[in-house]
C-alpha cells in the first residue's frame, strides 16, 4: 500500500497531523477522509480560482512554503495566470490527431514517433515482432533526443513545432535507421540518458452520449508530489521543479534529460511529457486516450 510505504516521508515532511497517516497501517477497506481538502474545494466552488490564489488559502500555502524555506510569495500567487494554448493537430493515416502542444512535449513526440514509424510500414510486421519493436524504439529514441535539445516553454524559446513534425525533417532524422543494428546514441541526438519507469500521474478519458470528448492528464510530478500537505488546506505541494532541466544533460528523477531550452527561469513553465489525445475520424471523436508518464 503506497500510503503505508510513504508513511515515514509524510511524518518527516509535515510538522502537523495529516489525513494520510494513522497509528496503525492502512488496510484494504479503510476510508481516507480529507476534511481540510473538502473545505478548500467548497471554497473554490463558491469563489472560483481567486479563492485559491488569494485570501485565506494563499496565506496557508505561503505559510507552508515558509516552514520549508520555500520562496513562493502572496504576490507570486496573485500574479499567476493559466494560459490557454491552441492544441497541436496533425493527420495520420486518414485520422486527425489532436494533442497537447508546448510546453508539453507530448504532442510533438507523438507526431514524430507516428510519422517516423510509418516510413517502415509497420503493418507488414507482426505485432511485438523484433522488427516492429525496433522501429518503435528507434523512433522513440530520436523523438526524445529532440525533446532534450529543442523543447521548452514557447514563451521563452523559439517554438520549432512545425519543423520538428515536418515530413522533410523526420525523413532526414530517419535516414540512418537500419534493421541491421541499433543506431549509435551519438547519431541519435546530442543529449542522451538511460530510461526510467515511473508510476505517477493520473489520466482520464471521457466521451458522453452526445459525442463530447475530453482527455485530461494531471500530475503532482512525483508520488504524492513533495509529500508536503498544506496545513489547513489539505492538499499536496507538487515537486514540478524537477521537470525543469536543473543541469543540462543530467537526467531528472524519471530519467528524462533536458537542455538549455528547459532551464529554470522566473515565470517559466516547465516542460512535461503529458499527451492527452483525441483522435478524430471523419471529424468525429474516434479514440480518446492518454497515459501516466506521457
What are these regions (language model features)?
Residues 84, 198-201, 223, 272-274:
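Short, small/polar residue-rich loop motifs at catalytic or cofactor-binding pockets
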Residues 119-220, 233, 248-249, 256-257:
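Internal maturation/activation junctions in enzymes
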Residues 71-73, 213-283, 287:
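Active-site rim segments in enzyme catalytic domains, especially the processed small/beta chain
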Residues 35-43, 115-116, 207-216:
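Active-site-proximal alpha-helical segments within enzyme catalytic domains
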Residues 98-107, 201, 205, 216-228, ...:
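Glycine-rich phosphate/pyrophosphate-binding beta-alpha loops
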Residues 1, 101-121, 266-294:
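N-terminal accessory/precursor segments of enzymes
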Residues 1-54, 58-101, 105, 165-166, ...:
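Noncatalytic scaffold domains of N-terminal-nucleophile
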Amino acid at each position: 500500500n503506497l500510503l503505508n510505504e510513504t508513511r515515514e516521508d509524510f511524518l518527516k515532511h509535515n510538522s502537523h497531523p495529516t489525513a494520510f497517516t494513522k497509528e496503525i497501517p492502512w488496510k484494504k477497506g479503510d476510508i481516507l477522509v480529507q476534511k481540510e481538502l473538502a473545505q478548500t474545494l467548497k471554497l473554490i466552488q463558491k469563489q472560483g480560482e481567486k479563492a485559491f490564489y488569494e485570501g485565506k488559502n494563499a496565506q496557508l500555502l505561503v505559510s507552508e512554503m515558509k516552514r520549508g524555506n520555500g520562496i513562493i510569495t502572496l504576490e507570486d500567487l496573485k500574479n499567476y495566470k493559466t494560459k490557454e494554448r491552441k492544441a497541436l493537430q496533425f493527420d495520420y493515416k486518414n485520422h486527425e490527431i489532436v494533442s497537447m502542444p508546448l510546453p508539453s512535449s507530448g504532442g510533438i513526440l507523438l507526431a514524430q514517433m507516428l510519422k517516423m514509424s510509418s516510413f517502415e510500414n509497420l503493418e507488414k510486421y507482426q505485432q511485438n515482432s523484433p522488427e516492429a519493436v525496433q522501429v518503435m524504439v528507434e523512433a522513440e529514441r530520436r523523438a526524445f533526443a529532440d525533446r532534450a535539445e529543442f523543447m521548452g516553454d514557447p514563451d521563452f524559446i523559439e517554438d520549432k513545432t512545425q519543423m520538428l513534425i515536418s515530413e522533410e525533417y523526420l525523413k532526414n532524422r530517419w535516414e540512418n535507421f537500419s534493421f541491421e543494428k541499433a543506431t549509435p546514441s551519438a547519431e541519435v541526438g546530442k543529449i542522451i540518458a538511460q530510461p526510467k519507469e515511473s508510476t505517477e500521474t493520473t489520466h482520464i478519458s471521457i466521451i458522453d452520449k452526445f459525442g463530447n470528448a475530453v482527455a485530461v492528464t494531471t500530475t503532482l510530478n512525483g508520488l504524492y508530489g513533495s509529500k508536503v500537505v498544506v496545513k489547513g488546506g489539505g492538499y499536496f505541494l507538487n515537486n514540478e521543479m524537477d521537470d525543469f532541466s536543473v543541469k543540462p544533460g543530467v537526467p531528472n528523477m524519471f530519467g528524462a534529460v533536458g537542455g538549455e531550452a528547459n532551464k529554470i527561469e522566473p515565470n517559466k513553465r516547465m516542460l512535461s511529457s503529458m499527451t492527452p489525445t483525441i483522435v478524430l475520424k471523419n471529424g468525429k471523436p474516434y479514440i480518446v486516450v492518454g497515459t501516466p508518464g506521457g
